[in-house]
Swiss-Prot record:
Protein name: Adenylosuccinate synthetase
Pfam families to which the protein is assigned, alphabetical: Adenylsucc_synt (PF00709)
Provenance organism: Parasynechococcus marenigrum (strain WH8102)
EC number: 6.3.4.4
Keyword list, A-Z: Cytoplasm, GTP-binding, Ligase, Magnesium, Metal-binding, Nucleotide-binding, Purine biosynthesis
Single Gene Ontology BP annotation: 'de novo' AMP biosynthetic process
Amino acids binding GTP: 12-18, 40-42, 304, 330-332, 412-414
Active site: 13, 41
Gene: purA
InterPro entries attached to this UniProt entry: Adenylosuccin_syn_GTP-bd, Adenylosuccin_syn_Lys_AS, Adenylosuccinate_synth_dom1, Adenylosuccinate_synth_dom2, Adenylosuccinate_synth_dom3, Adenylosuccinate_synthetase, P-loop_NTPase
Length: 437
C-alpha cells in the first residue's frame, strides 16, 4: 500500500492529468485536494479527448473511488456538465464522491472576479475569471456557501441572505453590474444540490476509511508549485495551495499518511497569464514549441507562454514539495531542435544566484544563465523503453535529474497513454527511480 501525492513542479499545465491517469490504474482512491474550475486536464482515451476541470482523472477506472476534497471550490454547474459529458461517453460515474464541506462558487463570485480583474487594468493578475479567488476569499471570511448547504433550503436561505446582499451592493455601486435575484439563485442552486446529493460524503471519514483498509490513495493537485498562494510568484498566483502540503489540508489527512510525492514537469516551461518568466522565448522558437506542444489552456483556451526548462524553479519545487521523483512530459516536443537550452542559475544585479527570489519584482529582473545541450533531431514518439531513446535525449534527461537533484521515474512522449516510459512504478516499486545522474 502506498499513498502518493502528484503535484505540478512549474506553473501548471505540466501534464498532471496524463500522469494521474497512468497512476490511477494502481490507485483505489483518487483525491482532488484543492483548486476549482480554473484548472483543467486533458486525457486521451481510445482516440477520445476528454477535458475535465473538477473531476479527477481516475473516473475513467470503474473500480476507482474519485473524491473531490474539502480544499476544493466547486462550481456545480460545471461539475454537472462534466458528469453529463462522461455519461455521454459511457463512463461509469458511480465512484464519484464530493466532500460535503467543499465550498461552492456562486454566480456573484464569477461576476466579481471578472469585474475586479477589469478594474485592475495594467495591474491585472491574469485570472481565469471563473470566480475562484472570490470563493476562497469568502471561505477565509467565513461567509461562504458549502456543498452541504445546497441540500437544505432553509439552511441555504440563511447562509445566502447576508453574503448576497453584500455582493449585490458591491456589484451595483462599485462595478456597475446588475444585482442578482435571491430567489433565482436559490432555486438554481437547490436544483444543483438535488442532482449532486447522491455523491456527497464526509471527506475525512471517506479517506480514513480507505486508509484503514490499506487502500492505495492518490492525491491529485491542480495548477503548479509556482502558482501556490504562499510559495509561488505572488501576486501572480492562485488562491489555494497546490504544493504537496496542501494535500494534507485539502483532504484532511496528516503528513504521516503520505508515502511519496511525485512532481510533474514539462521538458520545457510554460506559463499562462501574467507574471515574471525568466526563460520565456519569443519568435520562431516560441511558435514552434506552442504548435508542437499544443500549448493552449484547457480552461481558457489562452495561448501559453513558452520558454526553456528552468532548473532554478525546478530545484525550488523539489524543496518545497519534498519530491521523491519526477515525471517529465512532452519530451517529444523538443524532437526537432538542434540545440536545447536549460537555465541553471539567474543573474540578478550582477550577481549569480541559484535560488528562487521571493519578490516578484526581483524575479522580473532575473536574467537566465543557460547551458546548451545538443538536440537529437529525430522522433521519440514511438519509444517505449529507455534504451529506445536517442543518446542525446537520454543525456538531456540525466542533465535535468542532476540539476534538480531528483530521479526521473516517468517520461511522457505524447498525449496517448501508451506513449509513456515508466522507469520505476512510483506506487508499487521501491522508493527510488532508475534514471538519475
Amino acid at each position: 500500500m502506498a499513498n502518493v501525492v502528484v503535484i505540478g513542479a512549474q506553473w501548471g499545465d505540466e501534464g498532471k492529468g496524463k500522469i494521474t491517469d497512468l497512476l490511477s490504474r494502481s490507485a483505489d482512491v483518487v483525491v482532488r485536494y484543492q483548486g476549482g474550475v480554473n484548472a483543467g486536464h486533458t486525457i486521451v482515451v481510445d482516440d477520445r479527448v476528454l477535458k475535465l476541470h473538477l473531476i479527477p482523472s481516475g473516473i475513467l477506472y470503474p473500480e476507482t473511488i474519485c473524491l473531490i476534497g474539502s480544499g476544493t471550490v466547486v462550481d456545480p454547474k460545471v461539475m454537472l456538465g462534466e458528469l453529463d459529458m462522461l455519461i455521454a461517453n459511457d463512463i461509469d460515474i458511480s465512484g464519484l464522491q464530493l466532500a460535503s464541506t467543499a465550498h461552492v462558487t456562486m454566480p456573484y463570485h464569477r461576476l466579481l472576479d471578472l469585474a475586479m480583474e477589469k478594474q485592475r487594468g495594467d495591474r491585472r493578475i491574469g485570472t481565469t475569471g471563473r470566480g475562484i479567488g472570490p470563493t476562497y476569499a469568502d471561505k477565509s471570511q467565513r461567509s461562504g456557501i458549502r456543498v452541504i448547504d445546497l441540500l437544505d433550503e432553509a439552511r441555504l436561505r440563511e447562509r445566502l441572505e447576508g453574503p448576497l446582499q453584500e455582493k449585490n451592493q458591491l456589484l451595483e455601486t462599485i462595478y456597475g453590474v446588475e444585482p442578482l435575484d435571491a430567489e433565482t439563485v436559490i432555486k438554481e442552486y437547490l436544483g444543483y444540490g438535488k442532482r449532486l446529493a447522491p455523491h456527497v460524503v464526509e471527506c475525512t471519514q471517506a479517506i480514513h476509511q480507505a486508509a484503514r483498509a490499506r487502500k492505495n490513495i492518490l492525491f491529485e493537485g491542480a495548477q503548479g508549485t509556482l502558482l501556490d498562494l504562499d510559495h509561488g510568484t505572488y501576486p501572480y498566483v492562485t488562491s489555494s495551495n497546490p504544493v504537496s502540503g496542501g494535500a494534507c489540508i485539502g483532504a484532511g489527512v496528516g503528513p504521516t499518511l503520505i508515502d511519496r510525492v511525485i512532481g510533474v514537469a514539462k521538458a520545457y516551461t510554460t506559463r499562462v497569464g501574467e507574471g515574471p518568466f525568466p526563460t520565456e522565448l519569443s519568435g520562431r522558437l516560441n511558435d514552434q514549441l506552442t504548435e508542437r506542444g499544443g500549448e493552449f489552456g484547457t480552461t481558457t483556451g489562452r495561448r501559453r507562454r513558452c520558454g526553456w526548462f528552468d532548473g532554478v524553479i525546478g530545484r525550488y519545487a523539489v524543496q518545497v514539495n519534498g519530491l521523491d521523483c519526477l515525471a517529465v512530459t512532452k519530451l517529444d516536443v523538443l524532437d526537432e531542435l538542434d540545440a536545447i537550452q536549460v537555465c541553471v542559475a539567474y543573474e540578478l544585479d550582477g550577481e549569480r544566484i541559484e535560488h528562487f527570489p521571493s519578490s516578484a519584482e526581483d524575479f522580473a529582473r532575473c536574467n537566465p544563465l543557460f547551458e546548451t545541450l545538443p538536440g537529437w533531431q529525430c522522433s521519440t514518439e514511438d519509444c517505449r523503453k529507455l534504451e529506445d531513446l536517442p543518446d542525446a535525449a537520454m543525456a538531456y534527461l540525466r542533465f535535468l535529474a542532476d540539476l534538480m537533484e531528483v530521479p526521473i521515474a516517468i517520461v511522457s512522449l505524447g498525449a496517448s497513454r501508451d506513449q509513456t516510459i515508466v522507469v520505476e512504478d512510483p506506487i508499487h516499486g521501491p522508493k527510488r527511480a532508475l534514471l538519475s545522474a
